[in-house]
């Protein structure tokens, strides 16, 4: 089996995809103890609606898109933004959530109030990042330019592969939309255009056997249109399809060799303002699942606020895992009629019961694996003797 390539060049080790940034959270996370009030998350994900205009072959929201078709109302989005500003989990930590990721469960930019929601969050002092398919990136330019980062899931280097993977011929539309937003942000000297490695637009690339030969081509496009970063990671099998899948055979040896060769070639296009990242540290040697932790402490570190299941757009459901959207076993609160009630259930007996009942063997590739690694090794075992700096 071919050895995995380095994820980033030495000069780029301080980057937004380096999980060691989580070490900055340990003084907060060490307050996570059964029976005590829990600190609120630093980051919260908000899924605005369960609707998408593409059909990616690996969609990890497919389960929820087929079963739930709601969106969160403008009224409730504003209430969420105001609640997150003041949320206080424990008096041992200052109030408020620092960042919101507007992401999955559907395509966020299709929501009619996305711009207003971004403005409300930013005005409340909360940083915003967005993951989008880019088809509607040409709308709400002013609001989008106020985000810290936007990751666009292009996942291809040619129109042909884009259509094969995503079901629609929208490659050129997405690339032009990205170019336009980058130019707009620079012209208005907006936050999105700040000269910082983690800010700006990122060309996202989920690796699949269909697109493994187009990495260099995609990197060239990303750099040419002004993206700050090219972020690649292997695709994973969605949680609801794991039973019927062999996660060890998604990528063949030839695919991994091609990936290594392509990413090494792509690094030649790096510059001080453009980075190429092939993120594999949450995967095994076959780019397969590698959830090597004993318990999921991440359920106490973040959450996803999602549309309700009762058809009322003023209500919300709160899940604890972005990789298992729609899995009721990981939902802390269903159909909340008041977002402020989230503070009451956070750290509750039900919260700990969910933690106790999670079987790691049933989990897909874990977005939050390093959260649990750090909790187990740095906080519980003090393997790094972190007080000795």
Give the residues covered by each predicted segment.
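Conserved Radical SAM active-site core
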Residues: 66-131, 135-146
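Detector for the c-type heme attachment site
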Residues: 59-65, 368-369
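Immediate flanking context of iron-sulfur cluster ligation sites
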Residues: 346-363
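Hydrophobic packing within well-folded, soluble alpha/beta domains
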Residues: 52, 56-59, 117, 121, ...
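Radical SAM enzyme [4Fe-4S]-AdoMet core and its adjacent flexible, acidic
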Residues: 1-17, 47, 65-78, 124-127, ...
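Flexible, acidic/Gly-rich N-terminal and inter-domain linker regions that tether
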Residues: 1-43, 54-58, 318, 361-366, ...
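N-terminal pre-triad scaffold of radical SAM enzymes
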Residues: 32-58, 98-103, 298-314
């Amino acid at each position: 089996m071919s050895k995995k390539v380095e994820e980033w060049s030495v000069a780029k080790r301080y980057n937004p995809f380096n999980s060691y940034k989580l070490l900055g959270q340990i003084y907060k996370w060490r307050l996570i103890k059964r029976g005590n009030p829990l600190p609120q998350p630093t980051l919260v994900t908000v899924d605005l609606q369960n609707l998408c205009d593409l059909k990616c072959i690996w969609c990890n929201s497919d389960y929820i898109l087929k079963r739930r078709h709601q969106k969160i109302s403008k009224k409730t989005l504003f209430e969420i933004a105001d609640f997150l500003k003041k949320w206080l989990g424990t008096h041992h930590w200052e109030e408020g959530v620092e960042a919101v990721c507007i992401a999955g469960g559907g395509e966020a930019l299709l929501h009619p109030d996305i711009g207003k929601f971004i403005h409300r969050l930013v005005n409340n002092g909360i940083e915003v990042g967005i993951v989008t398919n880019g088809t509607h990136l040409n709308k709400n330019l002013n609001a989008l330019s106020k985000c810290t980062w936007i990751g666009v899931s292009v996942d291809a280097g040619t129109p042909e592969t884009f259509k094969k993977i995503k079901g629609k011929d929208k490659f050129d539309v997405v690339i032009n939309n990205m170019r336009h937003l980058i130019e707009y942000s620079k012209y208005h000297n907006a936050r999105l255009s700040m000269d910082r490695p983690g800010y700006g637009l990122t060309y996202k690339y989920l690796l699949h056997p269909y697109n493994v030969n187009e990495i260099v081509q995609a990197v060239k496009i990303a750099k040419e249109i002004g993206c700050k970063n090219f972020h690649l990671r292997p695709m994973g099998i969605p949680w609801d399809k794991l039973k019927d899948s062999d996660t060890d055979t998604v990528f063949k040896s030839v695919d991994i060799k091609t990936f290594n060769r392509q990413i090494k070639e792509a690094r030649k296009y790096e510059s001080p303002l453009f980075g190429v990242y092939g993120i594999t540290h949450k995967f095994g040697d076959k780019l397969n699942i590698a959830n090597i932790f004993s318990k999921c402490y991440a359920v106490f570190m973040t959450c996803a606020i999602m549309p309700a299941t009762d058809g009322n757009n003023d209500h919300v459901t709160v899940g604890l895992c972005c990789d298992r959207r729609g899995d009721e076993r990981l939902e802390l609160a269903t159909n909340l009629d008041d977002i402020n009630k989230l503070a009451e259930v956070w750290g509750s007996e039900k919260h700990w019961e969910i933690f106790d009942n999670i079987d790691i063997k049933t989990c897909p590739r874990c977005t939050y694996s390093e959260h649990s690694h750090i909790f187990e090794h740095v906080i519980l075992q003090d393997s790094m003797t972190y007080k000795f700096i």
